[in-house]
Amino acid sequence: SVKSTIANNLKVKIAFEKLNESKETIEVAIGKKLPTVTGTISGTYSNSDTTSAAGVSTTPETFTDKYKISITQNLYDGGEKNLEIERSKIIYENAVINFYKTVQDLSLKAVEGYLTVINYEKSLESSEKNFDSVSRFLEEVKLKYELGSATITELKNAESAFSIAETNLFSAEQNYKVSLKTFESIVGKEAINLEDYVNVEDNLNFENIISEVYKNNFNILIAQNNIKIKELDLSKEKSSNRPTLDITASTEYSDGSRIDAGSENTNASIGLTLTIPIFQQNIDKSDIRKINSQILQTEIELEDLKDNLNIEVSNYYKNYLVSKSNLNTSLLTIEYANTLLESTQEEYNLGTKSITDLIEAETNLLNVNVEYFNANKNYLINYFNLLALDGSLIKLFEEYLPSYN
């Protein structure tokens, strides 16, 4: 299901195409270091008559065709092209990170959808068991009432409990059906057993998580790369003040003998051009100051991002611990509710407990089971959100990622 999600989701497809687009930026940057080759073909027809006191003179008709090839190669540009290649590689790296981030966000959404399905599935199972038990109790009370061994109050209480159980069952069925449709719309397939696929680590350490977040969080990696890009922009701007050296070679062939007798010419030339920036209206200095300001902004944004992530991790970790504690409490509560139901059933058989007591014990078991499923869902959602923040959630689904090399 994860593979289907990644393969078919439109956001993933867009991120993958942006990755391909940024790959072409590297090709363009490398291509700028190659020579420029141009070819020129021209044709000129000429014919003239001149009238003077001496009479009329006519220049023979000629059609001259020329063929010229020029090659220009930069020999030195202050390192600007190399800087642009390095810059384009970092932009591509950001595209890869953004692709991973898109897949991870989608995987997290799929996980949450899966947990919702499982939660409603378990709630439905408990509601079905509760409905069966209450139905059985109602039939038993009806029989006893007909025999005169049960009161009208007990009968009405059993009917009320049946009505509530019936409503709970209908609600659980609808919730489960809707969750299946929602999950299938996200993933494209039915839910699998996530806990069979993922080995959930029971003890997460806050300091370790924060350390991994600062090293591997996708937003932090992108922000760090943005600083590098701005620093390269600054180096490129400074290199624009340096001289550049280009070499140009050309060869030309012309034939002017197509109509009347003419001539053929072949020319070749080679030259060096040294360009020295002297004054650029202070635009370069202004751009340097602007880029320095942008570098400072991206550095501040990175620190602000770290602070926000620290708060986000703290909240998820707190919720993780609370949900873990609630999960353990729910297990103990279920154990107690099962024991209470068994005890109440025995006492009911002995006549020391009423049908009302038995229905209450059965309903209580349903409620604590539902609470457990909710606690388990919250526990796993907090767990996977922590994995997403430190960038490790994507590792669970790496085998489903398309190749981008």
Residue ranges and their predicted role:
Residues 1-38, 187-231, 306, 313, ...:
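Bacterial Sec-pathway N-terminal export signals of envelope proteins
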Residues 1-2, 371-405:
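Acidic, low-complexity, intrinsically disordered peripheral segments
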Residues 13, 36-62, 72-101, 221, ...:
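Small/polar (Gly/Ser/Thr/Ala-rich) solvent-exposed segments
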Residues 86-89, 152-163, 292, 355-364:
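Short, charged, amphipathic alpha-helical segments
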Residues 97, 102-216, 316-319, 323, ...:
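Periplasmic alpha-helical coiled-coil/stalk elements that build and connect Gram-negative outer-membrane
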Residues 151, 309, 316, 351-354:
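Alpha-helical heptad-repeat coiled-coil segments that mediate oligomerization/polymerization in large
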Residues 287-336:
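C-terminal structural cap/anchor segments
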